[in-house]
UniProtKB/Swiss-Prot annotation:
This is Lysocardiolipin acyltransferase 1. It is an enzyme of class 2 (transferase). It is found in: Endoplasmic reticulum membrane. It comes from the Eukaryota.
Length: 414
């Protein structure tokens, strides 16, 4: 079901709180639009608000009841939270495909369902990480994915709380500050035998004219090839993660994914708010078993740079040709889940999250006990992030305390 030729004019939510916020946002954005020339679409507002309220009420009423389990058995807490968070991750997929007609095409190598991997991908837009869920929902399990994100995002109400509970890895983009946190998080996943598929963007930022000019200046300074469709990768984090996961025996493969948008390219959240959803998203997958990767740091860096040279040529052929990856000689990958199963999950996701948020609003309105729980939980989410640095930091501390490990990586540093 596609909406390429149609514009959704109005989508009304059935709950009053969303209507009130929608009205306020519409007024505010219209005033802003007059100054900056930003066109706002109702379907963009609907998309953003639906995701926000789902993450907001989901964090409070689905994730927070299990917080005490963190202090008793962090591995059980992690197992449950991964699955709860995955229920929300199906919502953007469902909205993008079912309501906005986004088409996803995946070519290349097949995924091995449930395998532990590092996913490296070119960073064409700020939303690539979310669009990847459309791929993983069919070819893997959403509960396995972890993402490296900017630390500033963890304080965002709803979204940030859920990402903390999901144990995403928040970084400051300064390796001196990030290395220790990477060590602790990766070692924790290895110690509790938690399989993961860790998404990393070696380029560090999305492709824009400014980032491309900086990348090409770096290339000229170091005698490297200038790129048009990708940025030169930063390999320090990638090589560290691969080595650490390999040491912890928690890595089966590296998935090198090339993402491309043959028609419109929604560069940022602003474009989604305008209702500018991608008509098509193409993913080309290369799977490299871990035993085929170099073992030395220097060779692994060269390996990563070689993949980016290939991406540049692959994307050049894509955009200058027929705008698909069929020229590689590899056809569409058969998914590990049937389209009927995926469709059922998408419809159930829309139904569940459409009913869940207004139901929670109703409970807050009717019962003072729920209202107090709601308020106290928000206070806890805000204070714990400011005092301790986030739920994932508390989770690590609980694991260390219960297992008497002052530092998770001490055994590797001896």
């Amino acid at each position: 079901m596609h909406s390429r030729g149609r514009e959704i004019v109005v989508l009304l939510n059935p709950w009053s709180i969303n209507e009130a916020v929608s009205s306020y946002c519409t007024y505010f954005i219209k005033q802003d639009s007059k100054s900056f020339g930003i066109m706002v679409s109702w379907k963009g507002i609907y998309f953003i608000l639906t995701l926000f309220w789902g993450s907001f009420f989901g964090s409070i009423f689905m994730l927070s009841p299990f917080l005490p389990l963190m202090f008793v058995n962090p591995s059980w807490y992690r197992w449950i939270n991964n699955r709860l968070v995955a229920t929300w991750l199906t919502l953007p997929v469902a909205l993008l495909e079912t309501m906005f007609g986004v088409k996803v095409i995946i070519t290349g190598d097949a995924f091995v369902p449930g395998e532990r991997s590092v996913i490296i991908m070119n960073h064409r837009t700020r939303m690539d990480w979310m669009f990847l869920w459309n791929c993983l929902m069919r070819y893997s399990y959403l509960r396995l994915e972890k993402i490296c994100l900017k630390a500033s995002l963890k304080g965002v109400p709803g979204f940030g709380w859920a990402m903390q509970a999901a144990a995403y890895i928040f970084i400051h983009r300064k390796w001196k500050d990030d290395k220790s946190h990477f060590e602790d998080m990766i070692d924790y996943f290895c110690d509790i035998h938690e399989p993961l598929q860790l998404l990393i963007f070696p380029e560090g930022t999305d492709l824009t004219e400014n980032s491309k000019s900086r990348s090409n200046a770096f290339a000229e300074k170091n005698g490297l090839q200038k790129y048009e469709y990708v940025l030169h990768p930063r390999t320090t984090g990638f090589t560290f993660v691969v080595d650490r996961l390999r040491e912890g025996k928690n890595l089966d493969a590296v998935h090198d994914i090339t993402v491309a948008y043959p028609h419109n390219i929604p560069q940022s959240e602003k474009h989604l708010l305008q209702g500018d959803f991608p008509r098509e998203i193409h993913f080309h997958v290369h799977r490299y078993p871990i035993d085929t990767l170099p073992t030395s740091k220097e060779d692994l860096q060269l390996w990563c740079h070689k993949r980016w040279e290939e991406k540049e040529e692959r994307l050049r052929s894509f955009y200058q040709g027929e705008k698909n990856f069929y020229f590689t000689g590899q056809s569409v990958i058969p998914p590990c889940k049937s389209e009927l199963r995926v469709l059922v999950v998408k419809l159930l996701s829309i139904l569940y999250w459409t009913l869940f948020s207004p139901a929670m609003c109703l409970l807050i309105y009717l019962y003072s006990l729920v209202k107090w729980y709601f308020i106290i939980t928000i206070v806890i989410f805000v204070l714990q992030e400011r005092i301790f640095g986030g739920l994932e930091i508390i989770e690590l501390a609980c694991y260390r305390l219960l297992h008497k490990q002052p530092h998770l990586n001490s055994k590797k540093n001896e």
